[in-house]
Amino acid sequence: MAKRILFREEARKALEQGINQLADAIKVTIGPKGRNVVLEKKFGAPQIVNDGVTIAKEIELADPLENTGAQLMREVASKTNDVAGDGTTTATILAQSMVREGLKNISAGANPVALRRGIEKTTAYLVEQIAAHAKPVEGRKTIAEVATISAGNDSEVGEMIAKAMDAVGRDGVITVEESKSLETELDVVEGMQFDRGYISPYFVTDSERMVAEYENAYLLITSNKISSLQDLVPILERVAREGRPLLVIAEDVEGEALATLVVNRLRGVLNAVAVKAPAFGDRRKAMLEDIAILTGGQLISEDVGIKLDKVTLDMMGVARKITVTKDKTTIVTDGSTKAAVEKRVAQIRKQLETTDSEYDREKLQERIAKLAGGVAVIKVGAATETELKDRKLRIEDALNATRAAVEEGIVPGGGATLLHLSKGIPAFKAKLNAEEQVGAEIVYRALQAPLFQIAHNAGLEGSVVVEKVLEKEMPFGFDALTGTYVDMFAQGIVDPAKVVRSALQNAASIAGMYLTTEAIVVEKPEPKPAAGSAPKGMM
């Protein structure tokens, strides 16, 4: 395939057009008065969303040059979403502003490499400042406030997430499911989560969220490595006859065995997903036994004289629901094994009392928390399928934001933190050389963009709102819902520090890469062959 190569100004301009198209579609969603975006679906009803990363994933531009720019911007959103679970729209707005300002300076003759260094140094300074201004999350009220803001000012969601954290603890497992009713409700069930994901991405059932989800599944729990097809076939046949999904937890699944599971899953013969067993050595065996007890199954191991090909259905565990992502597996059970779980927890507590090792103590406490903590399930209800999907996305965002807040603390929300921190840039800039100072200036201007857009979406003049907030000190900001200038902490308008930090770092990273781009190589569209003339009819 022939390639098309563009250089310097022309290359950057083409990328910028793609960046702007994607950013303009996303930035209308920011703030309490942000608008929705409708996504056309090839099959089924269109999806109405208010979530930056979901919109970014849907956008594919016809022009390959512009599409390359859009993909760069998509990277900002998805990277921020992966790290912090929220703040994707803020990251996109910051990146677009840095790119626009940077391009102006490069056109005027600035050195792109020095600009990038200036942007990186200023961002590192701001990250330190964000950490310095962050307040630790204390009490249920703050958790509810963080969740409410992230869910688009839905206080019912905020209250529910605070309740869920009360039920299972701050480090507990909280999952979001679709409800059959109109109501959104909270349920605390028996279950466990461990840090291992699917072995192959071909196991996913939802390619948008990259997760494998099944209900009423069998679990094959083994400490062996599975590579031979002969070992696996009898089990697969038994499970397939039942018409239920299968989760395989093993030391490893490879070769013919893995290929068979993937092929059966893709052909729809048997819904299966394989994950590696958590932990290592003796601790791995103990955790597999915990999972077996929780799900009412048996640990299949040659140590206890059970071979894989002799496994029957009553030796397998059962889960009400399983959710597997690329790095986590969540198992939710129906509570029928409660007595056995309590017995197991008591046994681990006895071990805890007799151990002298600090490391062993920590790991035993971790096992108790996993077994006894349970899983809080938020069941999302709505009147229509479209509303249900939007509400579920908002709740997942709010949950991620709340976890991020617990981790690194909170800062004033609504774009106020970034704006107030920009006041320190002129003094910091003095430490940089003349060329790097231009990079610092680019970041300075970009920090005004999120609040400008929040005000703009609320139907106000962004630059006026920015000026008024700059006149006041941290933690004052603009409440776009009421149109007033308030103390953001007192009003409960807060953002997790981790979300603000990740948004800024990812925006600066992509902007720096873009500004130092000197050439772009894309595929050249092949000319379509001219249509042949129609055959002449018979006389």
Curated annotation (Swiss-Prot):
Keyword Cytoplasm present in the record's keywords: the answer is yes
**What InterPro entries does this protein's entry cite?**
Chaperonin_Cpn60_CS (IPR018370), Cpn60/GroEL (IPR001844), Cpn60/GroEL/TCP-1 (IPR002423), GroEL-like_apical_dom_sf (IPR027409), GROEL-like_equatorial_sf (IPR027413), TCP-1-like_intermed_sf (IPR027410)
Per the record's keyword annotation, is Cytoplasm included, yes or no? Answer: yes
**GO CC, any one term:** cytoplasm
Q: Name one GO molecular function term.
A: unfolded protein binding
Record: residues binding ATP: 29-32, 86-90, 414, 479-481, 495
* Substrates-to-products reaction catalysed: ATP + H2O + a folded polypeptide = ADP + phosphate + an unfolded polypeptide
Q: What is its EC number?
A: 5.6.1.7
Concerning Pfam families, the annotation shows:
Cpn60_TCP1
EC primary class? isomerase
Q: Which UniProt keywords apply?
A: ATP-binding, Chaperone, Cytoplasm, Isomerase, Nucleotide-binding
Tell me which SUPFAM superfamilies the record gives: GroEL apical domain-like, GroEL equatorial domain-like
Q: Give the subcellular location.
A: Cytoplasm
Primary subcellular site in the record, as a coarse category: cytoplasm
Q: Name one GO biological process term.
A: protein refolding
Note the superkingdom of the native organism.
Bacteria
Subunit info? Answer: Forms a cylinder of 14 subunits composed of two heptameric rings stacked back-to-back. Interacts with the co-chaperonin GroES.
The text of the family note is: Belongs to the chaperonin (HSP60) family.
Q: Which PANTHER family match?
A: 60 KDA HEAT SHOCK PROTEIN, MITOCHONDRIAL (PTHR45633)
Q: In UniProt terms, what function does this protein have?
A: Together with its co-chaperonin GroES, plays an essential role in assisting protein folding. The GroEL-GroES system forms a nano-cage that allows encapsulation of the non-native substrate proteins and provides a physical environment optimized to promote and accelerate protein folding.
Q: What is this protein called?
A: Chaperonin GroEL 2
Classification from the root reads: Bacteria, Bacillati, Cyanobacteriota, Cyanophyceae, Synechococcales
